[in-house]
Amino acid sequence: MKQMSHLDDIPSTPGKFKPYFHRTRWQSSVAKLAFWSLVFVGLIFIFFYRSPVSSNPADPSRRSLRTYSWGGPAWEKRVRSSARLRTRRGFSVLVTGAAGFVGTHVSAALKRRGDGVLGLDNFNDYYDPSLKRARQALLERSGVFVVEGDINDAALLKKLFEVVPFTHVMHLAAQAGVRYAMENPSSYVHSNIAGFVNLLEVCKSANPQPAIVWASSSSVYGLNTKVPFSEKDRTDQPASLYAATKKAGEEIAHTYNHIYGLSLTGLRFFTVYGPWGRPDMAYFFFTRDILKGKAISIFEGVNHGTVARDFTYIDDIVKGCLGALDTAEKSTGSGGKKRGAAQLRVFNLGNTSPVPVTDLVTILERLLKVKAKRNIMKLPRNGDVQFTHANISSAQRELGYKPTTDLQTGLKKFARWYLGYYNGGKKAAS
């Protein structure tokens, strides 16, 4: 007797059922309904219940959207005060991810030059939340109020735009990290795609619509082998989920620009480093492990090829961000209706000087006066690429972008900050 396969349920001739196919159309509809219901429930589970939970419920850095506290006269007063301009021609800027590495530096720079700045950050625990709190305290002393909330909270975003008619948004909030995407993929979709769409939805309905500058990533170049990387190069071969979400962000930006007249500028950052940096970046955890006497893993490419990065110092990145804000044209819509064509741009922000990771380690050894224990390993197939190299001609021409800090100088500044922050300045970098 012939064994029945799941393929045998399909009619060999359209409209003609096989003898053993007895399910009614009603039963089939119920089955389909049940299937899609399960899919829907599964998606809800992934995006709302799979996000990391704290082992300490009282830890404010791990709060969910439902527990953020905002609103009220006192809160609104702080929001207005922080966003108030100090110069006649200044901007009123909402900075998302303000307690992050780049967000902190950009917020401080904007405030120093007289712009009104309001920060927004959810203080998640992707890396040590206490570092984010320290950055927050730094900004508070500069007069920047950082609202604790999430970009997926539409009600909060709408309230912020009701209180302050922002002229610009600097969108730096994102789930960062290439390798972490293999452990928690849903967080990348939640922050980098859903969060971005939520922000754009609020911005397109605002009156006036703000001009938006946002952080894309050099990772969008993925498996591209042409160097240096140009904005005109292909970006359809992402090597990681993180890269894929950033590429998706660029396509989403194009859509909102085309339909709603939002002015959007994407910035592809190349390996940003410096004081107050991210602990998940190689230069940061290399420094930590070298000082502790732990071995560090240094990757090499195929056939012992060199792994190199276009390391870009934070002050240079900040100049590029401010240049993008200063040259951003106004959005052309209002209340969700497009009035005309709007500006849409994307720029590389790099240093144009790729440096082998082995050279970075050598510089750190000299600055820290400690010999590193090197463990050479093959580059894992988890999203990392062998090299990055930025072509910055477009940013130079249109933003006046000109990086001035070499890796030796930048790492010296980072090492001094690191030793002061973590070691009380016991070992000074020289």
UniProtKB/Swiss-Prot annotation:
Q: Which InterPro entries match?
A: Epimerase_deHydtase (IPR001509), NAD(P)-bd_dom_sf (IPR036291)
Q: Which Pfam families match?
A: Epimerase (PF01370)
- Which catalytic reaction applies to this protein? UDP-alpha-D-glucuronate = UDP-alpha-D-galacturonate
Q: Which domain of life is it from?
A: Eukaryota
Keywords of the record, alphabetical order, are: Carbohydrate metabolism, Golgi apparatus, Isomerase, Membrane, NAD, Transmembrane, Transmembrane helix
Compartments where located: Golgi apparatus, Golgi stack membrane
Which organs or tissues contain this protein? In roots, leaves, siliques, flowers, pollen and stems.
Per UniProt, the enzyme's principal EC class comes to isomerase
EC number(s): the record gives 5.1.3.6
Q: Does the keyword Membrane apply?
A: yes
Residue numbers annotated as active site = 242 (proton acceptor)
Q: Keyword Transmembrane helix, does the record have it? A: yes
Entries under Gene3D superfamilies matching the protein? NAD(P)-binding Rossmann-like Domain
Write out the residues that bind NAD(+).
92-123
Q: How does it assemble?
A: Homodimer.
Question: What is known about what this protein does?
Answer: Involved in the synthesis of the negatively charged monosaccharide that forms the backbone of pectic cell wall components.
Family (UniProt): Belongs to the NAD(P)-dependent epimerase/dehydratase family.
Q: What is this protein called?
A: UDP-glucuronate 4-epimerase 3
Q: Which organism is it from?
A: Arabidopsis thaliana (Mouse-ear cress)
